[in-house]
Amino acid sequence: MKIFVKTLSGSNFEIEVKPADKVSDVKTAIETVKGAEYPAAKQMLIHQGKVLKDETTLEENNVVENSFIVIMLSKTKASPSGASTASAPAPSATQPQTVATPQVSAPTASVPVPTSGTATAAAPATAASVQTDVYGQAASNLVAGTTLESTVQQILDMGGGSWDRDTVVRALRAAFNNPERAVEYLYSGIPAQAEIPPVAQAPATGEQAANPLAQPQQAAAPAAATGGPNANPLNLFPQGMPAADAGAGAGNLDFLRNSQQFQALRAMVQANPQILQPMLQELGKQNPQLVRLIQEHQADFLRLINEPVEGEENVMEQLEAAMPQAVTVTPEEREAIERLEGMGFDRAMVLEVFFACNKNEELAANYLLDHMHEFEDQ
């Protein structure tokens, strides 16, 4: 099959590959076509916001006929174990796992304090180690604090692009601190819907009156309330963020427990941890204020995500409650619903999941496939 390879300079070329080819084979093929200026050892290939690992195949990475992948060259030699760890040299003592490596700090046994120096959010001891490892992997491509600063510098140091610091920061913000997707945005352009203006950090105590930065945050909340309370299931608080107790810290996300939508989303993420990041992407379109808070306090968020789901058999009822009562769909959305039905699922079930996933066809398909056995038992 034919795929297109796009460079950071804006040019592109095509190569012939097979679905069973490994990413390492594709890198070798690119070096054969482009010569010494693209050595395989320094290549980093990105597809759909994901850095492709050498040992995986194109088919495993959903690379199909006429797909395009982005190629970058790192200034240091790539690790032969996989390109995901070779996106940039790690300056000073920052942790190298900032770009989606599985060796994250999630399995630690103690509850971490969400300070600015936390690299990636660590899951606390309230969940089993196996669970924390799974969710740690799902969240390992999110960076924050001083690690975020080093990631900005790493992207600037990688070469191949002419972006300035502000552009890199904008790309990271639009990608919700996912370095891999940010790099793709730098190359292909930042989608307009992904650009979220920075909002003020939630105040640590009930001193909003003394903190002028809190006022834009409060003013932004009513704007999210378009279309009624259930128009966007991923907008957990369409009528505005609930007021935190005066004694609650800024990192306290416990108020999410009272959100029926969050309970349903938590069940979906626990069933398929890999949808955590796309779920945050969709949530960010509806409630950027909440996503900012989640980004700043990822440890608290992972603690909530790890908590057992009460009444798992009622997940679909929760999803149904999160749906709008009356909705309109575009022709494109109707086609997406029909494609999901074509996979063999009941129309009512498809509609419930499709709207619960905020009309994201990929998320809906993943959820339907992961819960196929449950639907068959009903």
Curated annotation (Swiss-Prot):
Annotated ranges, domain STI1: 251-294
Keywords, alphabetical: Cytoplasm, DNA damage, DNA repair, Nucleus, Repeat
Location of the UBA domain: 146-189, 330-371
Xref: InterPro entries: Rad23, STI1_HS-bd, UBA, UBA-like_sf, Ubiquitin-like_dom, Ubiquitin-like_domsf, XPC-bd, XPC-bd_sf
Compositional bias segments (type: Low complexity): 208-235
SUPFAM superfamilies: UBA-like, Ubiquitin-like, XPC-binding domain
Major place of residence: nucleus
Similarity comment: Belongs to the RAD23 family.
Protein name in UniProt: Ubiquitin receptor RAD23d
Record organism: Arabidopsis thaliana
Gene this protein is translated from: RAD23D
